[in-house]
Amino acid sequence: MRIPRSETMNSSFLKARGQQDVLSSPLERVPPASRPGKAPLGTPKTPVLEDFPQNDDEKERMQRRRSRVFDLQFSTDSIHLASPNRNIDVSTTISKFTNTQITEHYSTCIKLSSENKITTKNAFGLHLIDFMSEILKQKDAEPTNFKVAAGTLDASTKIYAVRVDAVHADVYRVLGGLGKDTPPQGEESHSGDGSTLETERTKKPAKPKKKQSCKTIEQNLSNINVSEADGKCAVDPMFQKTAASFDECSTTGVFLSTLHCQDYRSELLFPSDMQTLSSGEPLELPDLGFVDMTDLEASLQQCVEDRPLCPSLAGFQFTKWDSETHNESVSALVDKFKKNDQVFDINAEAEDDEEDVPDGPLVEDFVDNDEPDLSAAGDHEEFRSWKELCQVQSNQEEVISLEDRDIQVMCSFLSMKPGEYSYFSPRTMKMWAGPDHWRFRPRPKQDATSCTEHKKKSAKKDFEINFDDDIDFDAYFQKTKAATILTKSTLENQNWKATTLPTDFHYETDNLIQLHLKPGKRSLKMDQDQKAKTEHYEEIEDYDYNNPNDTSNYCPGLQAADSDYEEADDLFADPVGTLDLESDPKTTQENGHISPENQGVDITTYQELNLVAEPQKVNKIEIHYAKTAKKMDMKKLKQSMWSLLTKFSRKEADTEANHTESGQEGAPEEVADEKKLSGLTKDLQTRLPPLMAQNLSIPLAFACLLHLANEKNLKLEGTEDLSDVLVMQGD
């Protein structure tokens, strides 16, 4: 027998004694006084080891667990709510509770009952049933409160019901464990020398399980087959709408003209899948890397070595400079310029202009009028004004000082390769579009006095308010003719769309120069310096208008007789240049006289050159076709045709139709003799209503006859010349 330790024994003894004074353990079914070997509490004598029973470790563990659970559950409640105890001594417990503690315990029970928090864990710690007599004693002095009594009975009933459920569950838990076989435990035997012998466990061999044969053929087909609703995938509604509106007779595909691709993958997407702006991150483009230029290094070095840095100073020597050689080079350069045809002679006289120049300064030298002014067609000065030379005296020239302009700005207008008279870049001067766009206009003559009056600026008067004057307020507050409120159109225009900027989608501008199918390559942007280097307009020669391509393919642009274009005869006067209108055969015929040179000559001949005339316009021919679909009641058409085939009257045909609609089938009818389709069509014109008779055609009648042949077992045969169809009853 194992001897227990003294510390364990003493602790277990003290703990057992301390708990027994307050509340007994729920597993103790025997009263405390019936325990053998227990010393009374009042004994001053020190307990002897022989007086105590054997120590039970399992019981101590259970007591420690219950005390820990009790502390966790009732930490906020009164200290007198003890651990669950089903065999509690009511007389000893009630005597130790004061009236205040009983009142607190009563309020706690009522609160838990109202909140429905009475469970199996705290049901045995609530002593409302045990304190019922004490509560009634306290309430005897007061009149009976039925509301308090009802709440007390309700809480007591809940506590008792939960206790019964807990006992019932424990009993079934114990009964469930009775039928189970406990595993065999190894028995320990102590030998005389203290060695322990353990018996080996005998393991029974596991029996092989028999495989049960089951049917693999499913009898219910609904468990195997998938329903049609589950088999159909989700169809895009836009796809259904587009497919429904597809015309099978059209030459274009159903989706090729409407679907679009979004990115470089060229994947066709439906409109519902399209994204206006991509919300994802941009694709990372692969690095193009660097190009190896080591092979070109040797050839580039050879080009640099052979060329001088400054060709104009190639022969100049700092230490061996000679004035004679310098003068010779300068004289040679001067002779070169003198031999040039375009040498500017300062002492030369100015050439006189044959045309008259209007006196006085010019007003509105440039008028921003893009359209030609045809109202003053008779004024010769209007059409030769663009050829006039602007002669401005030296004293009227406006001199721009360098202080007002930056040298860097002025250099941007200069040409990269200036000539003797072309210092500015033609690209900059392209803003002048010529005489058709900008035209010089003569300035009207003004008197000297009027010029001086315009120069004088009117002095600006200071704003003053005189508070002494009498103000007529009626003039300011009288009802005016002008509207004082905003009109409806003004309010509609001044809406939030007119004053609010569009939504900024933060679109990447780099996508504009990015190729669609090859996003790795981009369009190069040329700087202004590179553009200026590539623009060598000075090296381009004048265009030769007399080249064979233009002279052979020239089209005079002949005008038709009903043309709206009319030109005044005085527009082509002598000052600008005489134009022979009689050279155009079309114009000579309109004027009423034909020159003998043009008689008998084709109108396409113009100055002994065979030219292609303007093609003739084809008259617009309107083709009549059916622009709207024909509507036909096929059911009524079939009834009328069947009545004609069976020689029924119209009234009998209607009665038969009513019988068939109500579900009563009449006697089957047959075709008596042969009928022709052409005759049936003519008879149908009189039987049908006017609108249906107008829409009736041979194809519709033949389609109706085919339906009847299928339903009524008719036989159709064609004539020998295939001009008509014979209808007869089938076998």
From Swiss-Prot:
- Modification Phosphoserine occurs at: 12, 25, 67, 75, 78, 83, 91, 195, 227, 425, 489
Domain of life of the organism encoding this protein: Eukaryota
**Keyword hit for Nucleus:** yes
Cite the location of the cross-link Glycyl lysine isopeptide (Lys-Gly) (interchain with G-Cter in SUMO2) from the record: 481
This protein's UniProt keywords: Acetylation, Cell cycle, Cell division, Chromosome, Cytoplasm, DNA condensation, Isopeptide bond, Mitosis, Nucleus, Phosphoprotein, Ubl conjugation
Mark the residues carrying the PTM N6-acetyllysine.
Answer: 627
Q: Where in the cell is it found?
A: Nucleus; Cytoplasm; Chromosome
Report the source organism.
Mus musculus (Mouse)
Q: What is this protein called?
A: Condensin complex subunit 2
| Main location group | nucleus
